[in-house]
C-alpha cells in the first residue's frame, strides 16, 4: 500500500499508457518486476500471465489484485536476472515497466540473457524505462531529484539498458520511442530467430 501511495503522482501519468502498452498482448506473457500488480487489469482476458518479482512484499500486494484481473495469473518469487523458476522457450512476450532503471547495471546483461532464454524464438519484449533527458532544463530537474528517486525507489536515470540490448547476441531492438518528454523510453524488441 505504501508504495502505491508514494507512486501516486507518477501513476497519474502511467495509467494513461497502460491500456495500449498491454492491451494488445496475447498468448503467454511474462511480466518481469511485476511489483504490486498495477498492470493486471489491462491485460486481455486471453493472456496467460506469469508475474516475477524479487520482493515478497510486492508479491503479496500483487496477489490481492489477481482476483480483479481479467486473465489467468501465476506469481513467482524469483530474480529477473536468474529466473530459476521459469522454463525456457515458453513466452510470447516479456513486459517490464521500470524494472531496468532499478536493476543495477551489473545484473542487466544477466536479466537480458534470461529474457532471451524464456522467450520463444521470435518472441517479443516491451520495456518501459526512465532515462536522463537531453533537454538541459529537464536534466537539471532530474539531477535535483535523482538522489531522492534512487533512495526511495532504487531507480536511476543513467542505466545502460539500450546498450546492453544492442550488445546482446540473442535480442534485438525493433523500436524505441519516448512517451513523455525524452525521459520515459519505450524499448520494443524480439528474440532473434
PLM segments and residue spans:
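Core SAM-dependent methyltransferase catalytic element
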Residues: 169, 174-193
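A short acidic, Gly/Pro-enriched loop at the edge of an enzyme's catalytic core
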Residues: 81-94
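Conserved class I S-adenosyl-L-methionine
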Residues: 1-26, 38, 142
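Class I SAM-dependent methyltransferase SAM/SAH-binding core
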Residues: 30-83
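Conserved beta-strand signature within the Rossmann-like core of class I S-adenosyl-L-methionine
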Residues: 122-130
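A short SAM/SAH-binding and catalytic strip from SAM-dependent methyltransferases
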Residues: 93-107
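A short glycine-rich, Lys/Arg-flanked "PGG" loop and its adjoining helix->strand segment in the class I
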Residues: 109-121
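Short alpha-helix
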Residues: 153-169
